[in-house]
């Protein structure tokens, strides 16, 4: 007995601890908190922050473009070269020079030598000829060496046709475009979060409505059992309530599955698994604070999509300038200084102008101009589409506001009708079908009210996102004259 009591005590403690843990792990969250968490922690946000920083660094990396470039070079090489040096001309010149020198000297000694001068001259010239003839007509020279030559070189563009400034401009435009892309992604995340958060609230309301209907049908069924036992109604009438109760139970099961699925999607979006309670309810603003004409006129100044497409047009225009610059000559200065013991150096100015490369640069310019034109047209088309979305979303939001007022009146009428049908049935003046229809009508109106509020929330979100001001969505939750669906 003591062992069983101890085991029971431990089991109770374990159950209590698990219940306490589940309560502690459960988390309630408002829409404001959910948006803050999503924009801070989501993988998409982190990825676009990294891409934005990368674009900014690339733009900063090109700030020094156009400054002199200094390189340290080391060349290590060995060479072997064989040359055939012709010596024929050298031999002829040497023989002629020696012969002329000997002849002039003998002529100076003509008086002393007398008749022996000419034979002596011929003999010496023959000796010179024979001696020079020993020299080959050509000689092979072999050159070999191993060299390590360190140098410092410098190049500086003097004129590039505008390519330097265009490259800097394009890099800055890409950095700005990356910022707009990050902002656009944040707006998209807000829209996705609104959809997931308030869909979970919608499913919660549908679950509550189905639970209300199930409880009511269960109560009607129990009352019908009592009335059948007392003989006031037939078995067929009682079975009508039983079928209605079963249908209500099936609808409740479906609603419960939908609510759990929506909660899972929201937790997955927020990278959590503990969110079970949402504190920001569905809502409908009674008054429309936005003017349609102002929205249609001002959206190009706020829409990240339009601004990004305009940035694409500016990038296309920079490409046109770059293609034109590629047709122009370039001018540059250069220099090199040898760091070995010889200390050789060279400085100069060079020019380059491409005469033929196989690429039709004029067609490249035409292609770039067409791309710019296409970008302008696509921007205008995007404006038309956004105008249509703004108009449709504005109309849907206004219709949802009007429907909400009608639904509130219908709810009161449906509640009164159910009360009357229940009294009529008890007095045997009404049928079971009338009570069931009245109950279903009331439950349906509750569900329709929640659906209409969700429609308003999503229409408002689509309107603000198209306009480029979805970050203001939170301000509409706490506006005066707002009805909440709880």
Task: Provide a role label for each language-model segment.
Residues 36-46, 53-68, 114-119, 141-144, ...:
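A glycine-/polar-enriched beta->alpha junction
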Residues 51, 312, 336-346:
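Solvent-exposed loop/turn segments connecting transmembrane beta-strands
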Residues 2-4, 29, 57-59, 180-302, ...:
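Periplasmic alpha-helical coiled-coil/stalk elements that build and connect Gram-negative outer-membrane
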Residues 35-41, 91-135, 272-331, 473-486:
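Amphipathic alpha-helical coiled-coil scaffold segments and their short linker/junction regions
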Residues 47-62, 185, 189-210, 219, ...:
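Amphipathic alpha-helical coiled-coil segments
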Residues 76-80, 158, 337-341, 353-355, ...:
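Transmembrane beta-strands of outer-membrane beta-barrel pores
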Residues 72, 328-339:
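Transmembrane beta-strand segments that form the barrel wall of outer-membrane beta-barrel proteins
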Residues 7, 71, 76-99, 450-486:
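Acidic, low-complexity, intrinsically disordered peripheral segments
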